[in-house]
Amino acid sequence: MKDIPVFTTDDGVASLALQQIPHTGFAHITVHSASAFSDFLQECVGFCRTVGAERIFACGHKDLEQYPIYARVLSMQMPIPEDVEQACLFPVTVESLDKWLDIYNTGMKDVPNAVALSKQAGKELVEKGTAYFVHENGNVLGIGVVEDDTVRAIVSCQKGAGELVMNSLFGALCGDIVKVEVAENNGPAINLYQRMGFVTTGILKTWYDVTKIF
């Protein structure tokens, strides 16, 4: 299943994130413009259902506020601490990508607003050098995605290792501030970030549940 970056009809333009349908049954619609919003939303939702989506969420238009909120995506940040315990970082390679993707997609399966990654998406991360394993004493503690000053994703493979995995990913960051993006209803992640000292700086995006619009 492939995403559709530009989905167009006579009524509007949107991006459809469909890659997670085989994993979670979820589809995400980002509306870019709409001349007839209600009609266009129905067209988008109808298409997502046709390709197998069981839950459908949308963002990007003020008229979506009439629908139930599924998730607000928060921006959080903190100064990068000094002298914290860190494990070893290993960049993901083409040879280790399958293992990394398996950990990522398994760990993200039940995370609110998370998107499953395809093999092609994984290859793009490898090319950019932004995907990592976190190891300690030969054991995989977790994985992550780091871009510039932002930790884009983190998965802990061992109970209680989340803080160590995050601290280790700090080593791949640029600058003195670390940022994360997290769904407001992702309780475990919010609790981890707050315990570490992250503070909320804003709402980046609000997803609305449009599964039952017609």
Regions found by a protein language model. Name each.
Residues 1-43, 136-158:
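Conserved donor-binding loop and adjoining core beta-sheet/short helix segment
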Residues 1-8, 110-137:
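Active-site rim helix/loop that mediates acceptor-substrate recognition in acyltransferases
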Residues 1-6, 84-114:
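Short amphipathic alpha-helix that is part of the acyltransferase structural core
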Residues 31-87, 180, 204-208:
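Acyl-donor-binding surface of acyltransferase catalytic domains
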Residues 34-47, 158-173, 190-195:
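Conserved acetyl-CoA-binding loop-helix of GNAT-fold acetyltransferases
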Residues 54, 176-178, 199:
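Short acidic/polar active-site loop segments enriched in Thr and Asp
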Residues 61-72, 163, 185-203:
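Conserved active-site alpha-helix within GNAT-family acetyltransferase domains
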Residues 152-153, 178-181:
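Conserved active-site loop/cleft motifs that coordinate metal ions or position small ligands
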